[in-house]
């Protein structure tokens, strides 16, 4: 397959507009002093990472990951993200959700930063490997990921045309 040409044609624009987007928003939970919260994710009533499909943890147990379902509408996506944020803020009533990507304070004792509590040993070992390779500090950097799903009908059509 030659990928040196445009994947889509002008007539594909309407099918492309029927693609969906999901968001994963990572944020640290902090206490009233601005330090990383010492409350576990379970403290908020969410159980382990696999318990709630939309409110999870990323690298650290204190690092929320709010995951929206795929949506074709910016308004729907925004409503999901706002609702997930509100639920999280309410569930962890003694914590605040840090708004910035970079952590405000990192404890001198890095052992206070707990890796997310995961049932799958492979996922936990991957995070432990990240600690060994990069350290915990860099793993606390939080951000937003956009997940784009191209309209499956269009992808199927294009793949069929490529043979």
Tell me what each language-model feature is:
Residues 89-92, 135-139:
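Short, charge-rich binding segments
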Residues 1-48:
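Long, contiguous juxta-domain segments that are non-catalytic but functionally important
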Residues 106, 117-133, 140, 149-163:
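Loop-rich catalytic cores of soluble enzymes, especially ATP-dependent carboxylate-amine ligases
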Residues 22, 59, 139-143:
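Short, solvent-exposed loop/turn segments at the edges of secondary structure
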Residues 6-14, 50, 84-85, 128-133:
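Short alpha-helical segments and helix-capping/turn motifs at coil-helix boundaries
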Residues 40-118:
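Active-site acidic/histidine clusters and adjacent loop/turn architecture
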């Amino acid at each position: 397959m030659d990928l040196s040409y445009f994947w889509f044609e002008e007539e594909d624009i309407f099918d492309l507009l029927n693609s969906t987007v999901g968001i994963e928003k990572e944020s640290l939970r902090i206490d009233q002093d601005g330090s990383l919260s010492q409350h576990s994710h379970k403290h908020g009533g969410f159980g382990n990472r696999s318990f709630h499909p939309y409110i999870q943890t990323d690298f650290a147990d204190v690092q929320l990951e709010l995951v929206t379902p795929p949506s074709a509408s910016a308004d729907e996506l925004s409503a999901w993200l706002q609702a997930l944020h509100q639920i999280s803020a309410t569930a962890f009533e003694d914590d605040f959700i840090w708004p910035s990507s970079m952590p405000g304070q990192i404890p001198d004792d890095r052992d206070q930063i707990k890796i997310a509590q995961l049932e799958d040993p492979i996922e936990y070992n991957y995070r432990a490997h990240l600690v060994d390779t990069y350290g915990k500090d860099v793993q606390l950097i939080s951000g937003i990921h956009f997940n784009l799903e191209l309209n499956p009908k269009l992808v199927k059509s294009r793949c069929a045309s490529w043979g």
